[in-house]
Amino acid sequence: MSEEAPHPTRTPAAQRRQIVVITGLSGAGKSNALRAFEDAGYFCIDNLPPRMIPEVMEMSAGSPAGPEGVVVVADIRGRRYFGGELERVIDGVEGAGGWEKRLLFLEADDATLIRRYKESRRPHPAARGGDVLEAIRSERRELAPLRERADVVVDTSGLSALDVRLRFKRLAESLSGRLTVSLISFGFKHGAPLDVDTLFDVRFLPNPHYDPALRPLTGRDPAVREAVLAHPDAREFVERVCGLLSFLIPRYAAEGKTYFTVGVGCTGGRHRSVAIAEELARRLGAGRIGGEVDLYVRHRDLESG
């Protein structure tokens, strides 16, 4: 997996304080997300009872040295102990003066969650009788209302602990007021990412997989890149998509959007989508997008084949 920032730029930190509530499925990476926010300078609290969130906000705002950003993790256990209290608190936070609220929801597919629990050898908090799959499905149903309310939904399927921390490091930076644009290449045979805002399918382009000389390579290799971009449709596609994104991105930034994710998919996620995502990043990073943004590229399935 690859994640890089070809042309990051910086803007001043936002003036309003941030309250970030992280919730989602058990095993989806909430602890790693919390560490990423902590590394970014946020004041972080794990498993805080929801009714105490306004008190923490009040104490932070009342102190001259109080943190500019507070992050709270709430999981299924808190929901079972305190019922729908988190939703009520979020409703109250919406109107808090001087604060900007973000509700982040983490999820992953069943196979990823099961694998993580097997590797950690820890019990699922919602499991009864050791049936992890049923616990995951039950939790998914129970947390569906919170997912619908989330400002950002992040799918961590297939990501390592380090990848999750990197992902949330970018997100933590984006909440300071900059717009973070992420270009994600992927393979449809591995499933489309769930957390993209816009998705482009490049399977209409000739597939380098069928060229024996190119098959072992990836879209980051010059030979594959040249083969993909040699096709007139590929060049026109890149130009049209760059034009669309160049129009959209400054307008999203002006509206206060802080995170914009673009998916580029081919069959396996190793050749066409990688080459196109890299070319889009190169073009957009070369002055095609107005405003100040952070631009990242991630190749989700580069090593999957």
UniProtKB/Swiss-Prot annotation:
Q: Where does GTP bind?
A: 75-78
Pfam families in the cross-refs: PapZ_C, RapZ-like_N
Keywords for this entry? Answer: ATP-binding, GTP-binding, Nucleotide-binding
Residues the entry annotates as binding ATP: 24-31
What this protein is reported to do is described as: Displays ATPase and GTPase activities.
Q: Which PANTHER family does the record match to this protein?
A: RNASE ADAPTER PROTEIN RAPZ (PTHR30448:SF0)
Per the record, the similarity remark reads:
Belongs to the RapZ-like family.
Q: What is this protein called?
A: Nucleotide-binding protein Rxyl_2009
